[in-house]
Amino acid sequence: MGTLVGFGSLANIPEEKITDSITRRVLSGEKCMMVSWNIKSGTHAAAHSHPHEQIVWMIKGKCEARVSTERRILNAGDVAVIAGGVEHELWFQEDTELVDIFAPPREDFLAGGEPTWLQKENR
């Protein structure tokens, strides 16, 4: 997990290989966390929830997202805000780069843990 005070480059934050289809770079401050993801087409982020508020910013690619009972297609440039405690999941239809912002920071990610949505099928 990367920490930074002041200025820097995302490229200098170590990339973690989660599976053959998922990598991430984690940068955390005291009150929020940014996670840059690279996720291959065909990956499913299984239904899950967490107490953290989450903002999703699609940089590249395409996915179908479900937040509670609402479904949307997200493309590059799209954003979504997910309240803490709300169930959500994503199906990645193209190789995708996205940025998640979490507040407060995800304790499981600080410890280097796998995402709660990781399913056996994604390995």
PLM regions with names:
Residues 20, 33-49:
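Conserved short histidine dyad/triad with adjacent acidic residue
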